């Protein structure tokens, strides 16, 4: 190799007795090599010279001293890290920034650890406990109240009402009647035993009855049509001498004119208007 062949490929200065870099079978002095081929650091934007360590991740480059967590600035050299939105984060900062927070203790639920989810919130498994007995609930059935979450045994002991019919716990809903509580499916007509949930009903001696049973067993009967007089929804009726009539049935026994609000006479248990009763031997 001649002396001219031992010159820098770019500036042609002699490399004899100097440091140089061989690239693609060409020789370069250190200054030219750094100026032409060095990568630029993502952090400080300065060239990463040949005498510095070049750390590369996904075609991005850093000086060794610049390769740090974007949040806490601790070195990431030879340490695990996560890239998020073009930022490099150590695992601790990533967990604090991106992982779920425990609804109870407000601390980070670390990636890979077991977490419990309920109503859109997250808990550490050890924090998801019954408000009363403080035992972990895990995947067991639970009942939630404003004061917290409860395992079923503790909820029944502390809060539950018991059905007046079957004597079992009412966990939700229920019907209150005469200061007693029933399951919806246990609140039945005392006559025919059909469910009264979402049905109109009447009571007799503190027992509930559907309208059909109550009317059949207890309602007064119209002296004209003999059908029950229920009095529901504001229905009007007429009462006279221990007899009752639907208002639409209170008519003259002969001409059938309505006697509601009119004077009338009686004859042999018959109700007559004044005109029809004037020729009969009536009771005043």
Curated annotation (Swiss-Prot):
One of its GO terms (molecular function) is zinc ion binding. The keyword Nucleus applies. InterPro entries: FHL5_LIM2, LIM_FHL1/2/3/5_N, Znf_LIM. It comes from the Eukaryota. Residues 39-100, 101-160, 161-220 form the LIM zinc-binding domain. GO terms for biological process: DNA-templated transcription; positive regulation of transcription by RNA polymerase II. Testis-specific, temporal expression is coordinated with CREM. GO terms for cellular component: nucleus. Gene3D superfamilies: Cysteine Rich Protein. Keywords: LIM domain, Metal-binding, Nucleus, Repeat, Zinc, Zinc-finger. It is found in: Nucleus. CDD domains: LIM1_FHL, LIM2_FHL5, LIM4_FHL. A zinc finger (C4-type) spans 8-32. May be involved in the regulation of spermatogenesis. Stimulates CREM transcriptional activity in a phosphorylation-independent manner. Interacts with CREM (via the third LIM domain). Interacts (via second LIM domain) with SPAG8. PANTHER family: FOUR AND A HALF LIM DOMAINS PROTEIN, FOUR AND A HALF LIM DOMAINS PROTEIN 5. This is Four and a half LIM domains protein 5. It comes from Mus musculus (Mouse). The gene is Fhl5.
